[in-house]
């Protein structure tokens, strides 16, 4: 632990508080992302939460991931949400998704019909590294390995029909960054008749301020896409024929690149052959560099497969390519320069780093979901990415930001980059878990 922690509760007290958040949200099978706004199990939330558990509670990490893997579809799809039938007051609920229309969906659990970013191999590898001697860990990792292979195979088989080694997402919710300005132009181009929009009633604005959440027009399009998937029985080939949202996203592919490397490391440790995963990681990194790099902006940009154009929006998640070890040293320096500019304030300007969207961009908001607030998971990815390239001072600044936000404001979903005030769900699980990972690290 660092000796120069900011003033506030002692580190031991902060650790205890973070563990209390996770205990409060633990259901016995999985950890709720938040106590009111998010009652079900979310895919990448559970993987990030498991990173924290791997530091002190490996049994719970195994149970967390096992519950998610138990809901995996026959085709390898790892669902965004596993629904808890005890919590019905949520939109969209299981009945809205009609995921059971797919012959691949599980019959013993209700799930959504989309995915979230692939950080699961990273979580399993962290568990093996941090708790290899704990009872049941190696056996769990051996079983999880086949689940992870099936998951990654699904992505490369079903989401990369052109064989580019870049996978696409088909819904903003699949990005994990639902309300990012990166999706605005695509959503606005989707002309819908009233009859196209399924009936729904939002639950999120009952628990947090509507000023913090996506606007209704965006939600109409989110709901329309779900309807489109269900009408096509979640058949990927049929969906991509006319789905208006097909994006090769930087964060998703960068995390997949990292996850493929981590899957290769798992394979080596477990006595399996790693070469196929190493090759896919290398090819995906090459594809990100060849297709998604934008020299003018000094970072990578997502690609809209429908319009055939790059998404020219500066957002912090596009810098997660550093975590995936995608750029060479020259490009990494350019990315650091952009992160250090007033756009994101890693080292310049005032406030808390880093904003999730360009401070100078149209529609920047310090409080609205993914349109400016600081997210601990993005800071965590960037912290590790910068450290991999030797940028220790900048990585330490992000580490200090994570600790300071949790210590001074609490374990919120996201934070105002100017004031530090917490927004969204309070008692947010991945914030607590990643704080634990940071302060309990070696």
Curated annotation (Swiss-Prot):
Using the UniProt record, name the top-level EC class of this enzyme in a single word.
hydrolase
Q: Name the UniProt key words of this record, in alphabetical order.
A: Glycosidase, Hydrolase, Plasmid
Purpose: Hydrolase that catalyzes the hydrolysis of mannosylglycerate (MG), a solute produced in response to osmotic stress in thermophiles, into mannose and glycerate. Can also hydrolyze glucosylglycerate (GG) to glucose and glycerate, with similar catalytic efficiency. Is highly specific for MG and GG, and cannot use mannosylglyceramide (MGA), glucosylglycerol, mannosylglucosylglycerate (MGG), glucosylglucosylglycerate (GGG) or trehalose as substrates.
- Name any one GO molecular function: Glc3Man9GlcNAc2 oligosaccharide glucosidase activity
Can you say what this protein is called? Mannosylglycerate hydrolase
What residues bind substrate, as annotated?
38, 42-45, 90, 116, 176, 213, 369-370
Can you tell me which family this protein belongs to? Belongs to the glycosyl hydrolase 63 family.
**Organism whose genome encodes this protein:** Rubrobacter radiotolerans (Arthrobacter radiotolerans)
Temperature-dependence annotation: Optimum temperature is 55 degrees Celsius. Retains about 28% and 14% of maximal activity at 30 and 80 degrees Celsius, respectively.
Biological process, per Gene Ontology: oligosaccharide metabolic process; protein N-linked glycosylation
């Amino acid at each position: 632990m660092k000796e120069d922690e900011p003033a506030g509760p002692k580190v031991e007290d902060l650790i205890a508080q973070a563990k209390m958040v996770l205990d409060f949200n633990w259901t016995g099978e999985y950890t709720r992302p938040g106590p009111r706004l998010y009652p079900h199990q979310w895919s990448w939330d559970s993987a990030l939460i498991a990173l924290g558990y791997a530091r002190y509670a490996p049994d719970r990490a195994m149970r967390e991931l096992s519950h998610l893997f138990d809901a995996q579809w026959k085709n390898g799809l790892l669902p965004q949400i596993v629904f808890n039938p005890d919590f019905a007051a949520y939109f969209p609920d299981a009945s809205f998704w009609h995921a059971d229309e797919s012959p691949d969906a599980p019959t013993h659990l209700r799930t959504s019909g989309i995915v979230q970013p692939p950080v699961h191999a990273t979580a399993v590898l962290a568990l093996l590294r941090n708790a290899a001697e704990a009872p049941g860990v190696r056996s769990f990792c051996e079983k999880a390995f086949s689940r992870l292979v099936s998951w990654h195979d699904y992505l490369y088989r079903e989401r990369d029909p052109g064989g580019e080694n870049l996978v696409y997402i088909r819904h903003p919710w699949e990005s994990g960054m639902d309300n990012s300005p990166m999706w605005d132009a695509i959503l606005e181009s989707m002309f819908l008749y009233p009859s196209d929009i399924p009936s729904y009633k939002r639950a999120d604005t009952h628990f947090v301020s509507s000023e913090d959440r996506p606007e209704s027009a965006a939600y109409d399009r989110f709901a329309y896409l779900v309807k489109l998937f269900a009408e096509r029985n979640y058949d990927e080939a049929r969906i991509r024929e006319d789905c208006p949202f097909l994006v090769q996203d930087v964060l998703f592919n960068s995390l997949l690149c990292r996850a493929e490397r981590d899957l290769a490391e798992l394979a080596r440790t477990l006595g399996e052959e790693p070469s196929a995963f190493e090759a896919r990681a290398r090819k995906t990194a090459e594809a990100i560099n060849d297709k998604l790099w934008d020299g003018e902006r000094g970072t990578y940009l997502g690609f809209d497969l429908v319009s055939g154009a790059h998404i020219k929006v500066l957002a912090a998640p596009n810098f997660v390519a550093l975590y995936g070890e995608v750029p060479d040293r020259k490009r990494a320096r350019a990315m650091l320069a952009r992160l250090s500019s007033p756009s994101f304030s890693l080292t310049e300007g005032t406030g808390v780093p880093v904003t999730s969207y360009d401070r100078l961009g149209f529609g920047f908001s310090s409080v609205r979901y993914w349109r400016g607030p600081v997210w601990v998971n993005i800071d965590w990815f960037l912290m590790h990415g910068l450290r991999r390239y030797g940028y220790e001072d900048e990585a330490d600044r992000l580490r200090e930001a994570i600790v300071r936000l949790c210590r001074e404001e609490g374990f919120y979903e996201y934070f105002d980059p100017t004031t530090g005030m917490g927004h969204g769900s309070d008692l947010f699980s991945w914030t607590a878990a990643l704080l634990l990972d940071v302060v309990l690290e070696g």
